[in-house]
């Protein structure tokens, strides 16, 4: 299939790829076309930085998707700024930049005046005259941006997809007004919006003050679907997921929605309804699945196996893996479970440090083997 890669200069490169290609493979193709070494490439899709050992399919990158290529600068460094809406901005900075400088860069990118910006790192609000180095902010650190409001207040609206929208409102705004603001931001007509707060559905003519909705309250937005309907998916752990679907959705579509919500790759999902396993190409209508039906989700482990990872604190983590998984993949799974970035992980087995590009099979790591995880310290020189 073809995908596109857009550079910061606005140039678009077209690549021929397979869903099974790893991010490493894609970077090698970009190097062939553009001469940029893979270690200077960072690829972004849907706001996420893509990890080398993962595949295009893992990130649900489909034909004609567009990736963004950001170059990793030698002397400078990149940091990320996350807004309350969940958007992540990438900035090129130097350790010697002041917080004022950083706010000016955010203004250049996003148009937000510095005096409305509050930057938070490691739970601390950053002061304008200090530098990034003063706060020990290093490459690929993430700052959080909170807007300082004048007069009004901010509230949050959380959608069923998990996205959070930030709105500027007054206590005297009516629910109609709020729905109009959501329409401005997201394009959803007010008559398709249902807003919930403290378990109550909010009525159009009433104000935020009537419902005691105060600054930084979170409302929940549920869509009233036209031809659409809700179905439930129950996992083996007993968790129930709610999905917005159409009768004409295929089983593939449903699995993609589950991936969006839960991060489970479609090829590891088996969906069961009325005792039957559902086939990818068929639609919900084919199986007579109607509104508020419940499907059952069973995970397919592929000739997978379990291994254990023991940390220096004595904690043991259990991972589901394949023999063909690379050490990169294993580190990504540890990151998913424990939040430890791969570049801070060293894995040891049988007294040997494991190299990223090699597979578990290369090291004869079999089911129920135990790896040891040692953390690589930032300032360290491993």
From Swiss-Prot:
Q: What is this protein called?
A: Polyubiquitin 4
Which compartment or compartments is the protein found in? Cytoplasm; Nucleus
The UniProt entry's sequence similarity note says: Belongs to the ubiquitin family.
Note in the entry:
Ubiquitin is encoded by 16 different genes. Ubiquitin is generally synthesized as a polyubiquitin precursor with tandem head to tail repeats. Often, there is one to three additional amino acids after the last repeat, removed in the mature protein. Alternatively, ubiquitin extension protein is synthesized as a single copy of ubiquitin fused to a ribosomal protein (either eL40 or eS31) or to a ubiquitin-related protein (either RUB1 or RUB2). Following translation, extension protein is cleaved from ubiquitin.
| Entry GO MF terms | mRNA binding
Q: Has UniProt tagged this entry with the keyword RNA-binding?
A: no
Q: Which Gene3D superfamilies match?
A: Phosphatidylinositol 3-kinase Catalytic Subunit, Chain A, domain 1
Species name: Arabidopsis thaliana (Mouse-ear cress)
Q: Which GO terms describe its biological process?
A: ubiquitin-dependent protein catabolic process
